[in-house]
């Protein structure tokens, strides 16, 4: 799901039409405040937000979006007419994953959105693999605990079978018990 945030209805409609044509489910918001409410209710996979908006700017919205507690990562693209490299860096420092400078042609827009989609797919795969690794580690810890318990019982049994634990010999004592090194 993609959230398009822009105070210009025309810009929202242009972006929405392109995204829907490429197969994305799109939701729109006309302000940063409205977008933040929508994100709290149902976090989007990808956000495309105008930088310059009245009220909560795209930059401020990006920071607040990153502060939300979310189960999965949301890819954030800031849209701006600012082409100064320091401004672009400011957007990235605020938490944006990409900054697109207007005017944006459909091929460039599609390429950036698809790059974001690839990032999200990789992130989901990594999350699933981390979950599997964590579950496997938990099982291994349980198995390790059971093996330790069995070794302790085996040690007790071994000790119960010995009549004498040490034998005094000339020059020292000989232990009749084997002890594990670990």
Enumerate the predicted regions with their spans:
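Alpha4 helix (beta4-alpha4-beta5 surface) of REC/receiver domains from two-component response regulators
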Residues: 60, 72-73, 83-98
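Charged docking surfaces used in two-component/phosphorelay signaling
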Residues: 13-21
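Short amphipathic alpha-helix used as the core "switch/output" element in two-component signaling
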Residues: 37, 59-70
């Amino acid at each position: 799901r993609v959230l398009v945030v822009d105070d210009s209805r025309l810009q929202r409609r242009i972006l929405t039409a392109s995204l829907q044509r490429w197969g994305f489910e799109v939701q729109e918001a006309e302000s940063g405040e409205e977008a933040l409410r929508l994100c709290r209710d149902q976090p989007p996979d990808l956000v495309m937000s105008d930088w310059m908006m009245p009220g909560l700017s795209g930059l401020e919205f990006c920071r607040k979006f990153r502060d939300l507690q979310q189960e999965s990562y949301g890819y954030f693209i800031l849209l701006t007419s600012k082409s100064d490299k320091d401004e672009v860096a400011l957007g990235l420092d605020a938490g944006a994953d990409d900054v697109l400078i207007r005017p944006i042609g459909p091929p460039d827009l599609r390429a950036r959105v698809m790059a974001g989609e690839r990032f999200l797919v990789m992130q989901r795969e990594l999350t699933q693999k981390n979950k599997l690794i964590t579950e496997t580690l938990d099982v291994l810890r349980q198995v390790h605990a059971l093996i330790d318990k069995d070794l302790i019982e085996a040690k007790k049994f071994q000790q119960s079978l010995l009549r004498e634990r040490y034998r005094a010999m000339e020059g020292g004592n000989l232990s009749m018990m084997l002890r594990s090194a670990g």
